[in-house]
Amino acid sequence: MGLEEQLPGGILLSTVEKVAGYVRKNSLWPATFGLACCAIEMMATAGPRFDIARFGMERFSATPRQADLMIVAGRVSQKMAPVLRQIYDQMAEPKWVLAMGVCASSGGMFNNYAIVQGVDHVVPVDIYLPGCPPRPEMLLYAILKLHEKIQQMPLGVNRETAIAEAEQAALSARPTIEMRGLLR
């Protein structure tokens, strides 16, 4: 006979990490960082038809200090990359990044010197969302996948080392193809 059978009804056993993960995943405040056409689909997700508020995202934060999720929606130019990194550094811990669309994930069809070939060269990305532009349903699905990832995130020192390792691996990763001018 285990401990669960001896407890009266209405008592739940859990760890602090699981409770914190549950609370954290249901109270995300995304930062508005729409850069191109994917931002239109991100705005549609906040509308009444798709209602992102049912997942705890009541409002999009205009300041990075009050946001913990950055949705990079669209292509990132070389001039915008330092601004993106500065906004990421100003966000409160814990923070997550969602790359929305092919342009944010890999540069998309814009294979030239002015566009960053994937936002993961600037900030560590937690979820990649494909599509050009991805539909609001896909953004909601990616947010649910991010909720699962947040639920499993450790706390304290374990969390800091996990984040540092993930960021270092993401920023030091080599591109999958070698770029030679505008032609491959």
UniProtKB/Swiss-Prot annotation:
* E.C. code: 7.1.1.-
State its location(s). Answer: Cell membrane
Reaction(s) catalysed by this chain, per the record, are: a quinone + NADH + 5 H(+)(in) = a quinol + NAD(+) + 4 H(+)(out)
GO molecular function terms listed in the Swiss-Prot or TrEMBL record:
4 iron, 4 sulfur cluster binding; iron ion binding; NADH dehydrogenase (ubiquinone) activity; NADH:ubiquinone reductase (non-electrogenic) activity; quinone binding
- Which terms under GO biological process does the entry name? aerobic respiration; electron transport coupled proton transport
According to its UniProt record, this protein's enzyme class is translocase
Cofactors named for this entry: [4Fe-4S] cluster
Q: How does it sit in the membrane?
A: Peripheral membrane protein
Keywords from the named record = 4Fe-4S, Cell membrane, Iron, Iron-sulfur, Membrane, Metal-binding, NAD, Quinone, Translocase, Transport
InterPro entries xref list = NADH_UbQ_OxRdtase-like_20kDa, NADH_UQ_OxRdtase_20Kd_su
Q: Give me the residues that bind [4Fe-4S] cluster, please.
A: 37-38, 103, 132
Q: What does UniProt give as GO cellular component? A: plasma membrane; respiratory chain complex I
The cofactor note from the UniProt entry for this protein is: Binds 1 [4Fe-4S] cluster.
- What PANTHER family is this protein classified in? NADH DEHYDROGENASE, NADH DEHYDROGENASE [UBIQUINONE] IRON-SULFUR PROTEIN 7, MITOCHONDRIAL
Its family remark reads:
Belongs to the complex I 20 kDa subunit family.
Q: How does it assemble?
A: NDH-1 is composed of 14 different subunits. Subunits NuoB, C, D, E, F, and G constitute the peripheral sector of the complex.
Function (record text): NDH-1 shuttles electrons from NADH, via FMN and iron-sulfur (Fe-S) centers, to quinones in the respiratory chain. The immediate electron acceptor for the enzyme in this species is believed to be a menaquinone. Couples the redox reaction to proton translocation (for every two electrons transferred, four hydrogen ions are translocated across the cytoplasmic membrane), and thus conserves the redox energy in a proton gradient.
This chain belongs to the protein called NADH-quinone oxidoreductase subunit B
Q: Which gene encodes it?
A: nuoB
